[in-house]
């Protein structure tokens, strides 16, 4: 946003998008507005975005199916988090986009195929339901 004039963009109309783990980051960028996360340069600029388009995002890292704690330790969601999500479900939930949804969330366009073999379709349905509920 600090370079908006240079790139001729409107810094008040910033959207983010990403696929899979990038979809997770898209959701977190759009939903987690904790000021403690604002570090580095350009702190005078807001990190808030005005739109999000996640593609097949993991949205509740505590809800992924795992057969055992041993198998879950090497799962994509545990590797993303840096800890075994099955052994610490509350921490996994708090690290998930679904725990960050508020009435102030920007507009979302969620794209997800219902035959996805990696990220269950219900992950997007859950986020969509929470976004709709908070907007009412």
Model-derived segments and spans:
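Alpha/beta-hydrolase superfamily serine-hydrolase fold, recognizing
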Residues: 1-136
């Amino acid at each position: 946003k600090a370079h908006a004039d240079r790139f001729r963009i409107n810094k008040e109309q910033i959207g983010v998008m990403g696929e899979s783990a990038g979809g997770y980051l898209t959701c977190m960028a759009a939903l987690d507005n904790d000021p403690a996360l604002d570090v580095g340069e350009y702190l005078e600029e807001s990190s808030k975005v005005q739109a999000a388009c996640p593609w097949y995002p993991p949205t509740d890292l505590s809800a992924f199916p795992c057969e055992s704690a041993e198998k879950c330790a090497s799962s994509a969601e545990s590797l993303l988090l840096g800890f075994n999500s099955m052994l610490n479900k509350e921490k996994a939930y708090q690290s998930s986009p679904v725990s960050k949804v508020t009435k102030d969330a920007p507009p979302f366009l969620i794209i997800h195929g219902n035959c996805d073999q990696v990220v269950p379709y219900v992950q997007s349905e859950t986020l969509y339901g929470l976004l709709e509920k908070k907007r009412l």
